[in-house]
Amino acid sequence: MTGSSIVSLMSQSLVVFMIWILPPLIASVIVGLTIGIIQAATQIQDESLPLTVKLLVVVAVIGLFAPVLSAPLIELADQIFTEFPAMTLGY
């Protein structure tokens, strides 16, 4: 296995990571901004409210999108385990 194939696998891993992290991150940012605006308008200064709601939203988004998000992760893991014997031949 050459260095370029390892770099290719690393870049594919980063893309899969971005695919996994973006939906919960976007949902958390939107909910956090919405709750922040509501708290500023009503002058409620409770710190646990935004954290609890964001946590529930992130868990819900991961639960809803897990089947869709798992496909690239499973493909990458299959590719890595298939190519692993070729990676270790020279060592």
From Swiss-Prot:
Locations listed in the record: Cell membrane
Keyword Nucleotide-binding: no
UniProt key word Transmembrane helix: yes
UniProt topology in membrane: Multi-pass membrane protein
Biological process, per Gene Ontology: protein secretion
Positions of disulphide bridges: none
Role: Could be involved in the secretion of an unknown factor.
PANTHER family linked to this entry: FLAGELLAR BIOSYNTHETIC PROTEIN FLIQ, SURFACE PRESENTATION OF ANTIGENS PROTEIN SPAQ
Name assigned to this protein: Probable translocation protein y4yM
Organism annotation: Sinorhizobium fredii (strain NBRC 101917 / NGR234)
